[in-house]
């Protein structure tokens, strides 16, 4: 807050403390123009001397007031520095939140990419299962044929008799060939099963790792959200305090304007009563109040003197 606003606020408080009740009491004691009477010149000079003494005391009070104003201005400057530091801290925190949002977006993109890779591996696993099922069917078919060939020896003999085979060993060789084919098929099926098991193990490890990463990111996001909520609550509190300070300053400025206007009106009335030229600025409220106080004090003293003389005359 600026120095001008501080001076106006404390000046209003000063007017209220120094002149509020005393000015009202003096005005109540002040007699009407018709009831006034001329006083001796000597008495008037004495009253002016007393007024000068009072004016000197007022000047001392003004100096005390100015020292108080300087102290308050230093305090307000410190408050302004702290306010600037708070705004800078809030700006840095907002930048920190923005950077963490960008990190979260990158983490989500990475998680989406990992999920797509997981789906691709699942498709590969399903394809391997289908191939394995086909191999099993082929194995079953060949096993059934082998069983048929090994059981019926007579049938083999008849086959030798009625076919191009001349000996049973040729049929056996044919059988061994089929057995070898069966072995190869079984080995291929086993290798396919091992591939499936390895793929399942890799998939389980990958899923566990990604679940841990997602949990860590969620915990980090929750912690950052809590810090953000606390910072936002602090910002709301400081904004409310700042609005209260601005409203209070506006009210005091309005009160000060009213006091200055009333002082100026009263000063103009006093100037008319004095019927002499006064060289006081319209903005110099302090000097206007000093002249008003001096005028009222003079009139009060004159009135007291008149009352005293009237009482003496009545007693005589």
Curated annotation (Swiss-Prot):
Subcellular localization(s) per the UniProt record: Cytoplasm, Perinuclear region; Cytoplasm, Cytoskeleton; Cell projection, Cilium, Flagellum; Cytoplasm, Cytoskeleton, Microtubule organizing center, Centrosome
Gene Ontology annotations for the cellular component aspect, listed alphabetically: centrosome; manchette; perinuclear region of cytoplasm; sperm head-tail coupling apparatus; sperm principal piece
Keywords attached to this entry: Cell projection, Cilium, Coiled coil, Cytoplasm, Cytoskeleton, Differentiation, Flagellum, Spermatogenesis
InterPro entries documented for this protein: CFAP_domain-containing (IPR051147), DUF4200 (IPR025252)
Keyword GTP-binding: no
SS bonds (residue pairs): none
Alphabetized Pfam families for the sequence: DUF4200
GO BP, sorted A to Z: acrosome assembly; centrosome cycle; cilium assembly; spermatid development
Coiled coil: 43-151, 182-236
Reported function: Essential for male fertility. Required for sperm development.
Known partners and oligomeric status: Interacts with ODF1 and ODF2. Interacts with CCDC38. Interacts with CCDC146. Interacts with CFAP53.
Family note: Belongs to the CFAP73 family.
Protein name per UniProt: Coiled-coil domain-containing protein 42
Lineage start: Eukaryota, Metazoa, Chordata, Craniata, Vertebrata
């Amino acid at each position: 807050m600026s120095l001008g606003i501080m001076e106006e606020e404390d000046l209003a408080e000063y007017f209220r403390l120094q002149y509020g009740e005393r000015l009202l009491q003096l005005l109540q004691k002040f007699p009407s123009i018709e009831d006034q009477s001329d006083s001796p010149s000597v008495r008037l000079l004495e009253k002016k001397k007393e007024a000068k003494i009072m004016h000197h005391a007022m000047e001392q009070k003004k100096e005390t007031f100015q020292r108080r104003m300087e102290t308050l201005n230093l305090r307000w400057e410190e408050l302004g520095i702290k306010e600037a530091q708070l705004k800078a801290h809030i700006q840095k925190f907002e930048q920190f939140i923005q950077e963490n949002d960008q990190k979260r977006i990158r983490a989500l993109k990475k998680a989406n990419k990992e999920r797509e890779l997981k789906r691709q591996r699942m498709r590969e696993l399903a394809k391997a299962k289908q191939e394995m099922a086909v191999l099993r069917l082929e194995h079953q078919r060949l096993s059934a044929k082998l069983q048929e060939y090994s059981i019926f020896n007579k049938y083999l003999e008849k086959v030798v008799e009625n076919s191009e085979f001349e000996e049973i060993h040729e049929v056996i060789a044919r059988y061994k060939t089929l057995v070898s084919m069966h072995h190869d098929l079984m080995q291929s099926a086993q290798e396919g099963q091992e591939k499936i098991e390895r793929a399942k193990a890799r998939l389980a490890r990958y899923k566990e790792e990604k679940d841990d990463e997602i949990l860590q990111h969620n915990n980090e996001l929750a912690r950052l959200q809590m810090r953000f909520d606390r910072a936002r609550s602090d910002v709301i509190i400081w904004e409310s305090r700042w609005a209260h300070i601005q409203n209070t300053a506006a009210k005091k400025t309005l009160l000060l304007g009213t006091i200055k206007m009333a002082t100026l009106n009263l000063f103009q009335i006093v100037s008319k009563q004095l019927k002499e030229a006064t060289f006081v600025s319209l903005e110099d409220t302090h000097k206007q109040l000093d002249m008003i106080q001096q005028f009222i004090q003079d009139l009060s003293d004159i009135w007291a003197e008149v009352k005293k003389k009237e009482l003496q005359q009545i007693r005589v």
